[in-house]
Design a protein with these regions (language model features):
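A short, polar/charged loop-to-alpha-helix boundary motif
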Residues: 54-66
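Glycine/small-residue-rich phosphate/adenosyl-binding loop
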Residues: 47-48, 65-74
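Short beta-strand scaffold segments in enzyme catalytic cores
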Residues: 35-43, 47
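Immediate flanking context of iron-sulfur cluster ligation sites
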Residues: 78-90
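Residues that line or immediately flank small-molecule/substrate-binding pockets and catalytic motifs
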Residues: 42, 88, 112
Length: 160
């Protein structure tokens, strides 16, 4: 059974989500969709990443979540990240949700919902499928206001 806990709060954000938002801002400054991700292990940040899909990267898998998971696996020397938590500014897509399940992330914290491309509580709801082999604890709505604003600003600029 997957547990989903909405964490909307007017209180200060935890440091990992603040760092994820900084990564999202950095990605936007590089012309990338503003998404940032952080992996923590035993409460310490071990990996940070923003989206990196555009030149010079040209990587269709260059989503912040995948990049942060790769870094964390490298730091820990294992692809099994079952004692790690992932903090991301936007609801993960199907590809990223699959990577989260494969890495066996313990807890997923995310900011803004993504009704069009998300796959956690939107779309295919990957972790709720019988074929999903791992289901992290899910905490949504953490830093959603700032994450949503970054996305709105980015796409408003793109449409100009």
């Amino acid at each position: 059974m997957v547990s989903v806990i909405s964490t909307f709060s007017p209180f200060p954000l935890p440091e990992p989500m603040r760092q994820a938002l900084l990564q999202a801002e950095s990605a936007a400054n590089q012309g990338e969709v503003p998404v940032g991700a952080v992996v923590t292990f035993q409460g310490k940040i071990i990996a940070v990443a923003g989206n990196a899909m555009q030149p010079p990267f040209v990587d269709p898998t260059g989503h912040a979540e995948v990049r942060a998971l790769r870094q964390a696996a490298s730091v820990l020397g294992s692809s099994r990240l079952d004692q790690c938590d992932l903090w991301v500014t936007l609801e993960p897509c199907a590809m990223c949700a699959g990577a989260i399940a494969t890495a066996r992330i313990r807890r997923l914290y995310y900011g803004a919902d993504d009704p069009k491309g998300g796959a956690v509580l939107s779309g295919v709801r990957l972790f709720f499928q019988p074929s999903c082999h791992h289901q992290p604890e899910i905490y949504n709505d953490l830093g959603s206001r700032r994450a949503s604003e970054l996305l709105r600003q980015f796409f408003k600029q793109k449409r100009k």
